[in-house]
């Protein structure tokens, strides 16, 4: 509802389907994450809509997008919470490094839509482990520097995340590795689906020496 309100669409403008009405035509949008189109480039009109969204937030110029949900334990606003399954096991060290560089740690799950739009529109440098929070760079202007710390094999199937960031000054850091067993599995009977546990959704860690060298060169 927050996003619709920012586009001038109120609750009274929304009509829900019901079994007492007959419709001559119904247009159903495709899933952004779970069908054959999820990893194809978005239509250009998508960005026309996104750019209409206005946010307000007096935030810092350098932000670290944290996945350390254990710091506050508020996960109700996370759609699919993979912060524990695909946990960066040395993120405490990663976060403290960026904080030492003057970055402010932010938790997107604790912000409203308007606050997130304002935060990412205003930030000049954005860094963090790849995940839902980093996708908010879709609101960032082209001149924003973005440092995406990529977990192993994540972008093998999650190209849609790239499309939310590639309009910025994007830098991928890839010197990461799985931390322990990364064997993937799915529930019995789920034929032809991606691993829902293990695999790319396994715990991982960052090579800190390599990260520091990488960041110093940007």
Q: What is each stretch, according to the model?
A:
Residues 1-218:
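The feature primarily captures lumenal catalytic ectodomains
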């Amino acid at each position: 509802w927050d996003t619709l309100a920012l586009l001038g669409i109120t609750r009274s403008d929304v009509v829900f389907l019901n079994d007492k009405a007959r419709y001559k035509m119904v247009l159903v949008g495709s899933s952004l994450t779970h069908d054959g189109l999820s990893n194809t480039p978005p239509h250009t009109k998508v960005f026309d809509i996104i750019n209409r969204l206005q946010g307000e937030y007096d935030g810092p110029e350098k932000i670290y997008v944290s996945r350390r949900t254990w710091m506050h334990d508020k996960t109700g606003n996370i759609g699919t919470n993979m912060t524990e399954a695909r946990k960066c096991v040395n993120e405490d060290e990663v976060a403290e490094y960026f904080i030492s560089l003057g970055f402010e740690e932010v938790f997107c799950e604790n912000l409203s839509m308007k606050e997130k739009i304002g935060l990412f529109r205003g930030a000049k440098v954005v860094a963090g482990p790849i995940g839902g929070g980093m996708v908010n760079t879709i609101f960032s202007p082209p001149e924003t520097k973005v440092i995406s710390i990529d977990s192993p094999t994540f972008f093998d199937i999650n190209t849609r995340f790239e499309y939310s960031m590639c309009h910025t000054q994007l830098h991928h850091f890839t010197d990461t590795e799985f931390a322990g067993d990364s064997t993937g599995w799915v529930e019995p009977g789920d034929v032809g689906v991606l691993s829902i546990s293990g695999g790319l959704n396994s715990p991982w860690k960052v090579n800190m020496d390599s990260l520091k060298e990488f960041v110093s060169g940007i």
